[in-house]
């Protein structure tokens, strides 16, 4: 049998030939994409003048750009897959960011394939926003490994072409999206949602009443000893409904990945600090930030309840994610997320966190999802000497993305001087409202990322906060900073308006406040 190195050497010429062919196809198809985008723009211009009667040409123009993006995504995936075969190593994670791109492209293809003329507007907006985020993440992983991974340039070229097409699709969609969506007034908001008895069973009922599909116990008293085994077993036996996996009290030293195709997974533990999942991957340890996550969930409808996610790589290990979520319509309830730098990666799509504790140091809540935190405890730990703490680092890279971080009715505290956030990407968007802000939050509130980057294009808002750190008199004076939002402005970042939670959250059984809290 040939050695792995000889196999790799044999495949490299084929890979290079494949690159030449793919790049040639990209040059041809990009020209056609420009033509389609140009024609589609004219369709959308007509639609903008006659919004009440969109023509079939308008829809066809938009769908054509989506199809073009999908064609390029398929080519990019073929390239990524070929590169994973040609660059096998013993320590794959240390050198190969292409696996990140491959996983993200699968997610993008899943979303693009679901777009058709009759989709709900907010679903389409979410999918296009997430597809762009996936490209940003692929490029970030390639950049993190640029010195050790020599095929990164080819993948980066393909990724950037796809990014351009997805940007065109998103721009066209935003240009025609209904501008007349009615925001509920404060008086019209219904009170805190209380789930029905049947819905409450999902997130409130004792485990014994849940009719779980698998039981995981380290001592062998369940159906499986590891979470990974339970996920694999239930995925093979799934009938398409919700899969409920009970994790008995104990410490699980595993890295868990719930892929895009594994939807509606619910992990149920015995409580914070009782059911604990621990990992130690870190950027300094050779992993891309994306792959450092102790638990990663990409499958739509993910729910986690009553457990703790930990990355114990330590404060000197740089990026080390405890929980990464890129699952649409996901809920994290009564959990704890513990780490240092980059503890919680709210990667993409619509997410909701309730009664959850999040601890960390640098940028410990980051990503580009549309996410609302309610009734959570957010605590910054003591940083390393000379290090500064930032609660958030929101990653919105395009003004058309419907993403951002909304922190409502939470407690934000810190062991040392900490900033509410800084702009990871140019159009970073974060709002803190109706929350308690401790005295260790810096009077300026927000910090630059680097120089003047994003300070005019970001959106940082505050509304109705309390506590010794809530005074806005010393807040930064950037044009993108809004320390005193109006009621109307704040309502845009509530559960009902920002993540359409009043539509999909009831089925999860979690209690939530759809609007501003009285």
Swiss-Prot record:
Full protein name: Probable pectinesterase/pectinesterase inhibitor 16
Organism: Arabidopsis thaliana (Mouse-ear cress)
Pathway participation: Glycan metabolism; pectin degradation; 2-dehydro-3-deoxy-D-gluconate from pectin: step 1/5
GO MF annotation list: enzyme inhibitor activity; pectinesterase activity
Tissue note: Expressed in siliques and floral stems.
Residues the record marks as carrying a glycan: 82, 161
Class in the EC hierarchy, top level: hydrolase
Subcellular location field: Secreted, Cell wall
